[in-house]
Amino acid sequence: MNATTQAPLDGRSARWAQHREQRRAELLDVARHLIHDRGPDVTMEDIAAASGTSKSIVYRYFSDKAQLQQELGRSILATMHRRLLQELEDLEAGGATPGAPERIHAMIRAYVETAERSPGVYRFIIRPSDGLNHFLDSVSRLIATFLPDSVPAPQMWAHGAVGFVEGSVDAWMTQQETHASDPTTPAPLDADDVVTHLTSWLMKGMHP
């Protein structure tokens, strides 16, 4: 009897868990698009309205804005991971063996393109909070796994590199925003130049 009644309960639990994850993913997608369109200052009320639901429902899936930030950061990180794998696979398919310069260039490009593709979302996930710390730590771990074996203390190097790149990209984006509102200010570098310079600087730091 217990086995007979347990199976339907387990089935309902599994369906509910699946529904919850699906709804959570939908809300996260709505939040991403809203932040992309309106910028990082959107509220949980804004997200609820765009989702056609109430704020209390949103809080069932995300306990607070910091958790939303962390989940969105995790989603962005997964996209960066896929881009890195694809770029390295493309290099290998072309007959190249990615060394330190190619790997670091690919990692920086993935980061810069993430910021450039959606400045609002990028600004949202790097706002000071536990969510930011989680995102940057996750990026550091991701980078460390892609570094060549020749790099000493890869975790330490990755943490330092991420801090350097994050600060540099933030300054670059601020310059973009300033120039957009006041064209008389110095024009910012384009994304390709940013990637090239950051790669060069980090490579010099790796081999002083």
What annotation goes with each model-predicted range?
Residues M1-D41, E45-A49, Q67-Q70:
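Basic, helix-initiating cap at the start of DNA-binding domains
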Residues Q22, I35, A66-T79, R83, ...:
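Alpha-helical DNA-contacting segments of helix-turn-helix folds
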Residues T43, Y122-I126, S181:
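Short, hydrophobic secondary-structure boundary micro-motifs
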Residues G52-F62:
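Short hydrophobic/aromatic patch on the recognition helix
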Residues E71, L85-G120, W157, A161, ...:
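Hydrophobic alpha-helical connector segments
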Residues A93-P98, E177-L189:
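Intrinsically disordered, low-complexity terminal tails and inter-domain linkers enriched
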Residues I126-D170, L189-T196, S200-M203:
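Amphipathic alpha-helical packing segments from all-alpha helical-bundle domains
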